[in-house]
Amino acid sequence: MSTLKVVSSKLAAEIDKELMGPQIGFTLQQLMELAGFSVAQAVCRQFPLRGKTETEKGKHVFVIAGPGNNGGDGLVCARHLKLFGYNPVVFYPKRSERTEFYKQLVHQLNFFKVPVLSQDEGNWLEYLKPEKTLCIVDAIFGFSFKPPMREPFKGIVEELCKVQNIIPIVSVDVPTGWDVDKGPISQPSINPAVLVSLTVPKPCSSHIRENQTTHYVGGRFIPRDFANKFGFEPFGYESTDQILKL
Ligand SMILES: NC(=O)C1=CN([C@@H]2O[C@H](COP(=O)(O)OP(=O)(O)OC[C@H]3O[C@@H](n4cnc5c(N)ncnc54)[C@H](O)[C@@H]3O)[C@@H](O)[C@H]2O)[C@H](O)CC1
Ligand SMILES: [K+]
Protein backbone atom coordinates (compact mmCIF):
# COMPACT_ATOMS: atom_id res chain seq x y z
CA MET A 1 0.00 0.00 0.00
CA SER A 2 1.33 3.46 -0.85
CA THR A 3 2.12 5.91 1.94
CA LEU A 4 -0.41 8.72 2.13
CA LYS A 5 0.96 12.13 1.40
CA VAL A 6 -1.12 14.99 2.69
CA VAL A 7 -1.19 18.78 2.60
CA SER A 8 -2.83 21.04 5.19
CA SER A 9 -5.87 23.19 4.42
CA LYS A 10 -3.57 26.22 4.39
CA LEU A 11 -1.21 24.69 1.86
CA ALA A 12 -4.11 23.42 -0.27
CA ALA A 13 -5.43 26.98 -0.49
CA GLU A 14 -1.93 28.24 -1.41
CA ILE A 15 -1.63 25.62 -4.16
CA ASP A 16 -4.99 26.70 -5.58
CA LYS A 17 -4.01 30.35 -5.39
CA GLU A 18 -0.77 29.78 -7.24
CA LEU A 19 -2.38 27.60 -9.92
CA MET A 20 -4.85 30.41 -10.58
CA GLY A 21 -2.30 33.22 -10.16
CA PRO A 22 -0.74 35.29 -12.95
CA GLN A 23 2.29 32.99 -13.40
CA ILE A 24 0.29 29.87 -14.22
CA GLY A 25 -3.09 31.29 -15.11
CA PHE A 26 -5.51 28.40 -14.77
CA THR A 27 -9.06 29.60 -14.40
CA LEU A 28 -11.28 28.27 -11.61
CA GLN A 29 -13.59 26.92 -14.31
CA GLN A 30 -10.83 24.78 -15.80
CA LEU A 31 -9.80 23.26 -12.46
CA MET A 32 -13.39 22.69 -11.39
CA GLU A 33 -14.19 20.93 -14.66
CA LEU A 34 -11.31 18.50 -14.09
CA ALA A 35 -12.18 18.09 -10.41
CA GLY A 36 -15.86 17.34 -11.14
CA PHE A 37 -14.89 15.06 -14.03
CA SER A 38 -12.64 13.02 -11.74
CA VAL A 39 -15.39 12.64 -9.12
CA ALA A 40 -17.74 11.38 -11.84
CA GLN A 41 -15.08 8.85 -12.85
CA ALA A 42 -14.77 7.69 -9.25
CA VAL A 43 -18.55 7.11 -9.10
CA CYS A 44 -18.32 5.05 -12.31
CA ARG A 45 -15.39 3.03 -11.01
CA GLN A 46 -17.08 2.33 -7.70
CA PHE A 47 -20.66 1.81 -8.90
CA PRO A 48 -20.42 0.51 -12.48
CA LEU A 49 -23.67 0.20 -14.44
CA ARG A 50 -22.44 -2.66 -16.58
CA GLY A 51 -24.34 -5.85 -15.80
CA LYS A 52 -26.92 -4.05 -13.67
CA THR A 53 -30.69 -4.52 -14.10
CA GLU A 54 -32.76 -1.71 -15.64
CA THR A 55 -34.16 -0.95 -12.18
CA GLU A 56 -30.68 -0.53 -10.77
CA LYS A 57 -29.63 1.60 -13.75
CA GLY A 58 -32.61 3.88 -13.20
CA LYS A 59 -31.61 4.73 -9.64
CA HIS A 60 -30.40 8.24 -8.92
CA VAL A 61 -27.04 9.60 -8.00
CA PHE A 62 -28.09 12.26 -5.52
CA VAL A 63 -25.60 15.13 -5.62
CA ILE A 64 -25.77 17.62 -2.76
CA ALA A 65 -23.99 20.85 -3.70
CA GLY A 66 -22.84 23.43 -1.15
CA PRO A 67 -22.45 27.20 -1.63
CA GLY A 68 -18.74 27.25 -2.57
CA ASN A 69 -16.36 25.60 -5.00
CA ASN A 70 -16.84 22.14 -3.49
CA GLY A 71 -20.49 22.56 -4.53
CA GLY A 72 -19.29 23.64 -7.99
CA ASP A 73 -17.35 20.38 -8.31
CA GLY A 74 -20.63 18.60 -7.54
CA LEU A 75 -22.51 20.49 -10.26
CA VAL A 76 -19.85 19.57 -12.83
CA CYS A 77 -19.79 15.96 -11.60
CA ALA A 78 -23.57 15.65 -12.12
CA ARG A 79 -23.29 16.80 -15.75
CA HIS A 80 -20.57 14.22 -16.50
CA LEU A 81 -22.53 11.46 -14.74
CA LYS A 82 -25.47 12.15 -17.03
CA LEU A 83 -23.17 11.73 -20.04
CA PHE A 84 -21.87 8.49 -18.52
CA GLY A 85 -25.43 7.06 -18.46
CA TYR A 86 -26.33 7.71 -14.81
CA ASN A 87 -29.48 9.39 -13.52
CA PRO A 88 -28.23 12.30 -11.39
CA VAL A 89 -30.42 14.68 -9.37
CA VAL A 90 -28.85 17.75 -7.76
CA PHE A 91 -29.93 19.30 -4.47
CA TYR A 92 -28.56 22.86 -4.37
CA PRO A 93 -30.12 24.49 -1.29
CA LYS A 94 -28.00 27.64 -1.10
CA ARG A 95 -26.96 28.85 -4.51
CA SER A 96 -23.76 30.76 -4.98
CA GLU A 97 -24.38 34.31 -6.09
CA ARG A 98 -20.62 34.84 -6.26
CA THR A 99 -20.32 34.68 -10.02
CA GLU A 100 -22.26 34.31 -13.22
CA PHE A 101 -20.32 31.11 -13.66
CA TYR A 102 -22.41 29.19 -11.10
CA LYS A 103 -25.59 30.20 -12.86
CA GLN A 104 -24.08 28.89 -16.08
CA LEU A 105 -23.35 25.53 -14.44
CA VAL A 106 -27.02 25.32 -13.45
CA HIS A 107 -28.12 26.29 -17.00
CA GLN A 108 -25.93 23.48 -18.30
CA LEU A 109 -27.63 21.02 -15.96
CA ASN A 110 -31.01 22.23 -17.22
CA PHE A 111 -29.76 21.69 -20.77
CA PHE A 112 -28.81 18.11 -19.83
CA LYS A 113 -32.24 17.66 -18.15
CA VAL A 114 -30.65 17.04 -14.76
CA PRO A 115 -33.13 18.20 -12.07
CA VAL A 116 -31.73 20.85 -9.70
CA LEU A 117 -33.78 21.04 -6.49
CA SER A 118 -33.89 24.11 -4.26
CA GLN A 119 -34.39 24.08 -0.52
CA ASP A 120 -38.05 25.05 -0.83
CA GLU A 121 -39.03 23.02 -3.89
CA GLY A 122 -39.56 19.28 -4.04
CA ASN A 123 -39.06 16.92 -1.18
CA TRP A 124 -35.35 16.17 -1.19
CA LEU A 125 -35.74 13.64 1.63
CA GLU A 126 -37.53 11.41 -0.88
CA TYR A 127 -34.13 10.72 -2.45
CA LEU A 128 -32.66 9.34 0.76
CA LYS A 129 -34.12 5.90 0.11
CA PRO A 130 -31.97 2.95 -1.04
CA GLU A 131 -34.63 1.79 -3.51
CA LYS A 132 -34.43 5.17 -5.20
CA THR A 133 -30.80 6.20 -4.89
CA LEU A 134 -27.61 4.39 -5.86
CA CYS A 135 -25.25 6.72 -4.00
CA ILE A 136 -25.02 10.24 -2.61
CA VAL A 137 -22.31 12.67 -3.70
CA ASP A 138 -21.34 14.90 -0.78
CA ALA A 139 -20.17 18.13 -2.44
CA ILE A 140 -21.29 20.37 0.43
CA PHE A 141 -18.03 21.68 1.92
CA GLY A 142 -14.38 21.16 1.08
CA PHE A 143 -11.20 22.69 2.41
CA SER A 144 -12.72 26.07 3.38
CA PHE A 145 -15.27 24.74 5.88
CA LYS A 146 -15.09 26.50 9.25
CA PRO A 147 -17.05 24.87 12.10
CA PRO A 148 -19.63 25.05 13.55
CA MET A 149 -21.91 24.17 10.68
CA ARG A 150 -24.82 26.51 9.98
CA GLU A 151 -28.28 25.69 8.67
CA PRO A 152 -29.55 24.44 6.34
CA PHE A 153 -26.46 22.24 6.08
CA LYS A 154 -26.47 21.12 9.72
CA GLY A 155 -29.90 19.51 9.27
CA ILE A 156 -28.94 18.06 5.88
CA VAL A 157 -25.80 16.39 7.28
CA GLU A 158 -27.84 14.94 10.16
CA GLU A 159 -30.18 13.34 7.62
CA LEU A 160 -27.23 11.99 5.63
CA CYS A 161 -25.75 10.42 8.77
CA LYS A 162 -29.01 8.54 9.32
CA VAL A 163 -28.87 6.83 5.91
CA GLN A 164 -25.15 6.44 5.29
CA ASN A 165 -25.14 2.75 6.27
CA ILE A 166 -27.75 1.96 3.62
CA ILE A 167 -26.81 4.45 0.86
CA PRO A 168 -23.10 4.91 0.18
CA ILE A 169 -21.74 8.45 0.36
CA VAL A 170 -19.03 9.70 -2.01
CA SER A 171 -17.33 12.71 -0.42
CA VAL A 172 -15.64 15.29 -2.60
CA ASP A 173 -12.22 16.34 -1.28
CA VAL A 174 -13.20 16.42 2.42
CA PRO A 175 -16.11 14.62 4.16
CA THR A 176 -18.50 17.45 4.98
CA GLY A 177 -18.34 18.57 8.60
CA TRP A 178 -14.84 17.20 9.16
CA ASP A 179 -12.08 19.55 10.17
CA VAL A 180 -9.78 19.58 7.14
CA ASP A 181 -6.72 19.00 9.28
CA LYS A 182 -8.11 17.10 12.30
CA GLY A 183 -10.86 14.89 10.83
CA PRO A 184 -14.32 14.29 12.39
CA ILE A 185 -14.92 16.86 15.11
CA SER A 186 -18.58 16.42 15.97
CA GLN A 187 -21.12 13.61 16.20
CA PRO A 188 -22.88 12.35 14.23
CA SER A 189 -20.37 12.66 11.41
CA ILE A 190 -20.28 11.58 7.81
CA ASN A 191 -18.33 8.37 7.20
CA PRO A 192 -18.03 8.16 3.45
CA ALA A 193 -17.89 4.89 1.52
CA VAL A 194 -15.69 6.73 -0.99
CA LEU A 195 -13.44 9.75 -0.59
CA VAL A 196 -12.10 11.56 -3.67
CA SER A 197 -9.23 13.80 -2.56
CA LEU A 198 -8.50 16.56 -5.06
CA THR A 199 -4.93 17.32 -6.15
CA VAL A 200 -3.51 15.79 -2.96
CA PRO A 201 -5.18 14.33 0.17
CA LYS A 202 -5.79 16.60 3.12
CA PRO A 203 -4.68 15.49 6.64
CA CYS A 204 -8.25 14.50 7.63
CA SER A 205 -8.08 11.66 5.11
CA SER A 206 -6.00 9.66 7.59
CA HIS A 207 -9.22 9.32 9.66
CA ILE A 208 -11.18 7.38 7.03
CA ARG A 209 -12.21 3.89 8.11
CA GLU A 210 -9.66 1.29 7.10
CA ASN A 211 -11.10 -1.36 4.75
CA GLN A 212 -14.44 0.45 4.63
CA THR A 213 -13.72 3.66 2.75
CA THR A 214 -12.27 3.56 -0.75
CA HIS A 215 -9.86 6.44 -1.23
CA TYR A 216 -9.16 7.96 -4.62
CA VAL A 217 -7.10 10.96 -5.59
CA GLY A 218 -8.37 13.03 -8.53
CA GLY A 219 -7.94 16.49 -9.99
CA ARG A 220 -5.05 15.52 -12.25
CA PHE A 221 -3.69 18.88 -13.21
CA ILE A 222 -0.21 19.52 -11.84
CA PRO A 223 3.23 18.71 -13.21
CA ARG A 224 5.99 17.03 -11.19
CA ASP A 225 8.05 20.19 -10.51
CA PHE A 226 5.06 22.00 -9.10
CA ALA A 227 4.16 19.08 -6.79
CA ASN A 228 7.77 18.84 -5.60
CA LYS A 229 7.85 22.57 -4.88
CA PHE A 230 5.00 22.01 -2.40
CA GLY A 231 6.75 19.00 -0.88
CA PHE A 232 4.88 16.06 -2.37
CA GLU A 233 5.31 13.59 -5.20
CA PRO A 234 2.81 13.49 -8.06
CA PHE A 235 0.52 10.46 -8.12
CA GLY A 236 1.05 7.61 -10.57
CA TYR A 237 -2.14 7.94 -12.61
CA GLU A 238 -2.44 5.34 -15.33
CA SER A 239 -2.99 6.15 -18.95
CA THR A 240 -5.82 8.68 -19.38
CA ASP A 241 -7.34 8.00 -15.92
CA GLN A 242 -8.42 11.05 -13.93
CA ILE A 243 -8.44 9.11 -10.64
CA LEU A 244 -6.06 6.82 -8.81
CA LYS A 245 -7.09 4.42 -6.06
CA LEU A 246 -4.77 4.89 -3.08
N1 LIG B 1 -7.07 22.45 -6.60
C1 LIG B 1 -8.13 21.80 -6.25
O1 LIG B 1 -7.97 20.79 -5.63
C2 LIG B 1 -9.46 22.34 -6.55
C3 LIG B 1 -10.44 22.27 -5.62
N2 LIG B 1 -11.66 22.80 -5.78
C4 LIG B 1 -12.69 22.58 -4.81
O2 LIG B 1 -12.86 23.74 -4.07
C5 LIG B 1 -13.01 23.40 -2.69
C6 LIG B 1 -12.73 24.59 -1.84
O3 LIG B 1 -13.63 25.58 -2.26
P1 LIG B 1 -13.98 26.92 -1.44
O4 LIG B 1 -14.96 27.69 -2.21
O5 LIG B 1 -12.72 27.55 -1.02
O6 LIG B 1 -14.65 26.36 -0.13
P2 LIG B 1 -15.80 25.31 0.25
O7 LIG B 1 -16.57 24.90 -0.93
O8 LIG B 1 -15.15 24.28 1.08
O9 LIG B 1 -16.74 26.13 1.22
C7 LIG B 1 -16.89 27.54 1.19
C8 LIG B 1 -18.35 27.90 1.36
O10 LIG B 1 -18.86 27.30 2.53
C9 LIG B 1 -19.39 28.29 3.41
N3 LIG B 1 -19.14 27.81 4.78
C10 LIG B 1 -17.93 27.62 5.36
N4 LIG B 1 -18.08 27.18 6.62
C11 LIG B 1 -19.43 27.09 6.85
C12 LIG B 1 -20.22 26.73 7.98
N5 LIG B 1 -19.68 26.39 9.16
N6 LIG B 1 -21.57 26.70 7.86
C13 LIG B 1 -22.16 27.09 6.71
N7 LIG B 1 -21.47 27.49 5.60
C14 LIG B 1 -20.11 27.50 5.68
C15 LIG B 1 -18.67 29.56 3.05
O11 LIG B 1 -19.42 30.69 3.39
C16 LIG B 1 -18.54 29.39 1.53
O12 LIG B 1 -19.75 29.77 0.88
C17 LIG B 1 -12.07 22.25 -2.54
O13 LIG B 1 -12.30 21.51 -1.37
C18 LIG B 1 -12.37 21.49 -3.81
O14 LIG B 1 -13.53 20.67 -3.66
C19 LIG B 1 -12.01 23.66 -6.94
O15 LIG B 1 -12.93 23.01 -7.73
C20 LIG B 1 -10.77 24.05 -7.76
C21 LIG B 1 -9.73 22.97 -7.86
K1 LIG C 1 -17.40 17.39 0.63
Swiss-Prot record:
<dbReference type="InterPro" id="IPR004443">
    <property type="entry name" value="YjeF_N_dom"/>
</dbReference>
<keyword id="KW-0479">Metal-binding</keyword>
<keyword id="KW-0630">Potassium</keyword>
<protein>
    <recommendedName>
        <fullName>NAD(P)H-hydrate epimerase</fullName>
        <ecNumber>5.1.99.6</ecNumber>
    </recommendedName>
</protein>
<feature type="binding site">
    <location>
        <begin position="69"/>
        <end position="73"/>
    </location>
    <ligand>
        <name>(6S)-NADPHX</name>
    </ligand>
</feature>
<dbReference type="InterPro" id="IPR032976">
    <property type="entry name" value="YJEFN_prot_NAXE-like"/>
</dbReference>
<keyword id="KW-0496">Mitochondrion</keyword>
<feature type="binding site">
    <location>
        <position position="176"/>
    </location>
    <ligand>
        <name>K(+)</name>
    </ligand>
</feature>
<dbReference type="Pfam" id="PF03853">
    <property type="entry name" value="YjeF_N"/>
</dbReference>
<feature type="binding site">
    <location>
        <position position="70"/>
    </location>
    <ligand>
        <name>K(+)</name>
    </ligand>
</feature>
<feature type="binding site">
    <location>
        <position position="173"/>
    </location>
    <ligand>
        <name>(6S)-NADPHX</name>
    </ligand>
</feature>
<dbReference type="GO" id="GO:0000166">
    <property type="term" value="F:nucleotide binding"/>
</dbReference>
<dbReference type="GO" id="GO:0046496">
    <property type="term" value="P:nicotinamide nucleotide metabolic process"/>
</dbReference>
<keyword id="KW-0963">Cytoplasm</keyword>
<keyword id="KW-0520">NAD</keyword>
<dbReference type="GO" id="GO:0005739">
    <property type="term" value="C:mitochondrion"/>
</dbReference>
<dbReference type="InterPro" id="IPR036652">
    <property type="entry name" value="YjeF_N_dom_sf"/>
</dbReference>
<feature type="binding site">
    <location>
        <position position="138"/>
    </location>
    <ligand>
        <name>K(+)</name>
    </ligand>
</feature>
<dbReference type="GO" id="GO:0046872">
    <property type="term" value="F:metal ion binding"/>
</dbReference>
<comment type="similarity">
    <text>Belongs to the NnrE/AIBP family.</text>
</comment>
<keyword id="KW-0521">NADP</keyword>
<keyword id="KW-0547">Nucleotide-binding</keyword>
<feature type="domain" description="YjeF N-terminal">
    <location>
        <begin position="12"/>
        <end position="234"/>
    </location>
</feature>
<comment type="function">
    <text>Catalyzes the epimerization of the S- and R-forms of NAD(P)HX, a damaged form of NAD(P)H that is a result of enzymatic or heat-dependent hydration. This is a prerequisite for the S-specific NAD(P)H-hydrate dehydratase to allow the repair of both epimers of NAD(P)HX.</text>
</comment>
<keyword id="KW-0413">Isomerase</keyword>
<dbReference type="GO" id="GO:0052856">
    <property type="term" value="F:NAD(P)HX epimerase activity"/>
</dbReference>
<dbReference type="GO" id="GO:0005737">
    <property type="term" value="C:cytoplasm"/>
</dbReference>
<feature type="binding site">
    <location>
        <begin position="142"/>
        <end position="148"/>
    </location>
    <ligand>
        <name>(6S)-NADPHX</name>
    </ligand>
</feature>
